[in-house]
């Protein structure tokens, strides 16, 4: 028998962070989740984040200098109103390039490191993919503060409970190794990344430190949400 749960968001759910046109945000009412027996992670995801058989066209525009890669990742997913029907943006931090796989193919792909869609972030491991990537969260206000990878504290995405229920962060996004990565301003209806650096570890032992500079990285449209400005470096 099917069961339906409503997972309510805290005034936003990615959407409350500016539409594609930069207009004032409005909160979503919530997500409807239909869960079937078997605990396939794809079936317990809220409708806004269900796998889509489409490849993202979001731009990954980065440059590397002095060992630091900086730039923007367009995870706007067509804007707030259209995002439920648009895929995640998949990125390989080793090459600084978009990985052109749809959400369905990404579940069996080891080519990508992180995925982004509005304010939902994922790593290729655990419930999100077979890549065996793990993430450690390091309290740090700048990338320069992280000179070596932590020895412990790595986790993978885990948004499906043992009894096949959806696990979310307070904003309504599926729980990932990034955890509660942002603070939400109820008055301004905007979000700001926490002062954290995320160290991604791959199964070959290589590690990359990533910092989210801002969720509003489009200089031409400052209130356009999910246009990430990021920086990262590879650790020894």
Predicted regions and their residues:
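Low-complexity, compositionally biased segments in intrinsically disordered regions
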Residues: 23-25
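C-terminal motif of bacterial Sec signal peptides marking the signal peptidase cleavage site
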Residues: 14-16
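Bacterial signal peptide processing site
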Residues: 18-21
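Bacterial N-terminal signal peptides that target proteins for export
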Residues: 1-6
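Hydrophobic helical h-region of N-terminal Sec-dependent signal peptides
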Residues: 7-11
